[in-house]
Regions:
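N-terminal helical cap/lid subdomain that shapes the substrate entry/recognition surface
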Residues: 15-130, 142
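Asp-based, Mg2+/Mn2+-dependent phosphohydrolase catalytic module
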Residues: 1-23, 47-53, 108-111, 133, ...
Length: 247
């Protein structure tokens, strides 16, 4: 789906005003830094010297396993499959899942997996897309209620603060805190209730089929493509879709 398009299966006309917006986080508002930079950071904290070539090789190997930001599906092994299934519902499972994934990196040095997980959760690892802050501020200035709805297993609020967008959301709903993860209907309904709108009056903005499950509740949904950190992802289209709230 292009950023200019939305799907509306609510049974209502698409002219029905959108009065609140739900945003996914990773892949929608921000992306992790280039993987080679994270690998170099991990090497530094582990006291390992890597040349540019080896850093690139390790980054490519980890990306091929489906590390965050790679755009590749995760290659989940039986040794951490249970943790992977629960990664968005438990901090412990989230850590176990991603450390397990990184542990399979060919040529990794001692301490690599733990260091990569530490870097993943660090606020400075995350880079907002070029249109994230302008879009959120424009919606906020127009009085549009906003909620962050994220499948995640660690507290992303310090990341939001680092990106200077923490004060732009009325509610921050994290799957591991509420006990529901997208595509479960409950997490979308929870967001709508908190924002004080009916599902048919809301827009979900995300980058995955889990986000698109909001359509089943009558929430119009905008999906954006995989985009490199710092580039324009296309969420600025939201400002053209949302009606000004009634006075």
């Amino acid at each position: 789906m292009r950023p200019e398009d939305t799907n509306d299966t609510s049974g209502e006309s698409t002219d029905r005003p959108i009065r609140a917006v739900l945003f996914d986080f990773h892949g929608t508002l921000a992306q992790v830094e280039p993987l080679r930079l994270s690998v170099e950071w991990a090497a530094h904290v582990c006291g390992v010297t890597l040349g540019e070539y080896r850093s690139t090789v390790l980054a490519d190997a980890l990306g091929a396993l489906g590390w965050v930001g790679s755009g590749q599906p995760a290659k989940v092994l039986p040794s951490f499959a249970a943790a992977w299934a629960d990664r968005d519902l438990s901090e412990q499972s989230h850590q176990e899942a991603f450390v397990g994934l990184a542990s399979g990196t060919s040529g990794a040095f001692e301490g690599f997996a733990d260091a990569m997980y530490e870097r993943l959760c660090a606020p400075e690892t995350w880079i907002a897309y070029a249109d994230t802050v302008p879009t959120l501020r424009a919606l906020r200035d127009r009085g549009v209620p906003l909620a962050l709805v994220s499948n995640i297993g660690f507290d992303v609020r310090p990341v939001l603060k680092h990106l200077e967008i923490d004060d732009l959301f009325d509610h921050t709903i994290l799957s591991y805190e509420v006990g529901w993860a997208k595509p479960e209907p409950a997490i979308f309904l929870d967001a709508c209730i908190r924002l004080g709108v009916e599902p048919g009056d809301a827009l979900m903005v995300g980058d995955s089929m889990a986000d698109a499950a909001a359509i089943d509740l009558g929430i119009r949904t905008l999906l954006v493509p995989h985009t490199e950190p710092g580039e324009r992802v296309g969420i600025d289209a939201v400002t053209r879709l949302v009606h000004r709230p009634r006075a």
